[in-house]
Amino acid sequence: MSSGANITYASRKRRKPVQKTVKPVPAEGIKSNPSKRHRDRLNTELDRLASLLPFPQDVINKLDKLSVLRLSVSYLRAKSFFDVALKSTPADRSRGQDQCRAQVRDWQDLQEGEFLLQALNGFVLVVTADALVFYASSTIQDYLGFQQSDVIHQSVYELIHTEDRAEFQRQLHWALNPSQCTDSAQGVDETHGLPQPAVYYTPDQLPPENTAFMERCFRCRLRCLLDNSSGFLAMNFQGRLKYLHGQNKKGKDGALLPPQLALFAIATPLQPPSILEIRTKNFIFRTKHKLDFTPIGCDAKGQLILGYTEVELCNKGSGYQFIHAADMLHCAESHIRMIKTGESGMTVFRLLAKHSRWRWVQSNARLIYRNGRPDYIIATQRPLTDEEGREHLQKRSMTLPFMFATGEAVLYEISSPFSPIMDPLPIRTKSNTSRKDWAPQSTPSKDSFHPNSLMSALIQQDESIYLCPPSSPAPLDSHFLMDSMSECGSWQGSFAVASNEALLKHEEIRHTQDVNLTLSGGPSELFPDNKNNDLYSIMRNLGIDFEDIRSMQNEEFFRTDSSGEVDFKDIDITDEILTYVQDSLNNSTLLNSACQQQPVSQHLSCMLQERLQLEQQQQLQQQHPTQTLEPQRQLCQVEVPQHELGQKTKHMQVNGMFASWNPAPPVSFSCPQQERKHYSLFSGLQGTAQEFPYKSEVDSMPYTQNFAPCNQSLLPEHSKGTQLDFPGRDFERSLHPNASNLEDFVSCLQVPENQRHGINSQSAMVSPQAYYAGAMSMYQCQAGPQHTPVDQMQYSPEIPGSQAFLSKFQSPSILNEAYSADLSSIGHLQTAAHLPRLAEAQPLPDITPSGFL
């Protein structure tokens, strides 16, 4: 600043430093210039001193030597003031140093001072009695455009309008009456450009510090680089005069001067901001870019919002690396529009902040010309909320292929190199996604694209920025998965008590799904209830893929080796099913209560096979009238999918006599006899040896796949005069009438419901003591102390067609030899051992009127 008519104001004084090159030290002792060695040592010390300043690295890199010395002196003076003002001794500081460091580490991300300054509508300014800026907050840049490092330890008069300097000098005096001339130019040293106070005051000459006489409130105009109209901004200063301790200044005689007064004030704009400025003044930031959108600068507000320093932002490379892949082409279109017209218009996109977080911003970029040619780009950005960003994304026109998933491959004529990232189905997290999963087999290299292209910028982005981990990542354990499966099983079991029509429809749908899964295969077979259930949604939200679910099911659900199984690989065993099976086998009350039954349609092939066995039993009964057949070796065993067992156990015995067969129309078929296969169905149950007295028989339960030959769609009728013997005790005749056709025969098939709890059904046929043949329990039939012989049941001779049915299937070549061998091996001793307990046995559920035990 000069005097008279040649008055100048403050401007940006920072100079861009020259890039320094480190020269190698010569191997031999070559003589060098002593003055050069002195300059090198001085520059080294200045660089070390600059690194200790509490400023960002980008600011330090642009400081000249005088600015480094000026800011170093200002920092030391401020430190001395706080040491005295806070009244802390060196001993106290040493004791609390460790605690302060721990608190700084704990609250490193919480910059309370920055938040207070942002909430303040203005900036903090401390001016000494000799008009030097002792301190200015960093928010001075938002109002005046000057950096904090530009004004500290500079004359405040360089910032004040010439017409307001006298008023400002008057406010600095404690009595509002400075002894010198009001013309500030006369009190200025031409050599240093600083006002020289005439008198230094002692505390005895000054009023108390806390008096109202020390309060100040005035207005003046300050130099503003952001105002293009007048270049000045009217500010209101409100504060008070306080002692500036710890300066240790000396007078002309060398004596130590007492602390002098200084103005501590808050400068706020005199003109109140508009509503829009109040909302956005703390969020709008500006960035500077090259013509190819490479960032070369960012203001302090942008560094606070994005979290980057200016050096980190400028050394990254292309600016498109900070843009979301789905918004790259949208921003590229605005970039081209700006090159053609000079302004991009409002563009909404996602900007990458630090710590891999995306921020929605609304940007408007302009071209800045120099000498008639475009020089650089200034982009003004305003952060948006996530809701506002989604609204703009929905309104965005999709006529152009802006989305990467739809347009990027078309533009570059290649497949997407980040297909796992853009895949919407599997939501992966860092914990369960390895690096190999992200590396596709045909990933193009960086050299195959132009370094300034969008694809090159996309490839240079880190894959982790597109990962979306949950806010509270909880480790996935097997208990959570088991609970989800149990809830799913309970939900399925609630449908078991519905009406018969709904049950049959549900079974038909599930059987159709099982057939489709078996035919299609693949990862979908892990979900037998299709992909619309709650379990599948939970798996997707947790980021579990099909392989993880398969391994979890093998470890937590199966608990058995399924390497030799054929059709049991899709079994989804739950705790509910295992508990129900175990209770059903252990509970003896199942055999002591009368049950009510409901008819249910069965598959034709099972009925044909059962009817064949009934006729086979008739022949054996006629040959051995005193021999009791062992029912467990004559039962038609069919496979029941385990995922249907949870509902089937609510209607029938666990042995699976009547499973859910495919309700296909009856057709003629012929199946050859197959070899028996043994499956250990209950090997996973704990405590079976103590709870089941016949564990060996249960574990070795035969699984047979024997199909009877049949060349007609309907059952032939029985011949007249054919008798069927029932060897056993406490047997009564069937309450059902004899059937003359297939419909009547099917109606005799009874399936109990709610047998375990004794719940009465609404539409059921009550048979208190009727004992039917055709099904059996897992337990062997044990005899009771009382037994009463009953007469044998005979078929009515009036039924036509019975003899034709027997004559057709009594051929030795057609009958199953496996059953004949087992029947022949049954002895009278084994039957007699179980006869005493027959009185305790009650009617078994799934039995036809004609059959065997």
Swiss-Prot record:
Q: In which tissues is it expressed?
A: Expressed in all tissues tested including brain, heart, kidney, liver, lung, spleen, skeletal muscle and thymus.
The family database entries (InterPro entries) matched by this protein are listed as: AHR/AHRR (IPR039091), AHR_bHLH (IPR033348), bHLH_dom (IPR011598), HLH_DNA-bd_sf (IPR036638), PAC (IPR001610), PAS (IPR000014), PAS-like_dom_sf (IPR035965), PAS_fold (IPR013767)
Instruction: Indicate, by first and last residue, each region the UniProt record lists as having compositional bias (Polar residues).
Output: 440-451
Q: Where in the cell is it found?
A: Cytoplasm; Nucleus
PAC domain location, by residue?
346-384
Keywords annotated in UniProt: Activator, ADP-ribosylation, Biological rhythms, Cell cycle, Cytoplasm, DNA-binding, Nucleus, Receptor, Repeat, Repressor, Transcription, Transcription regulation
Motif mapping: Nuclear export signal? 63-71
Which stretches of the sequence are propeptide? 1-9
One of the record's GO molecular function terms: protein homodimerization activity
Can you name this protein?
Aryl hydrocarbon receptor
Q: Which organism is it from?
A: Rattus norvegicus
Question: Which lineage?
Answer: Eukaryota, Metazoa, Chordata, Craniata, Vertebrata
Gene symbol?
A: Ahr
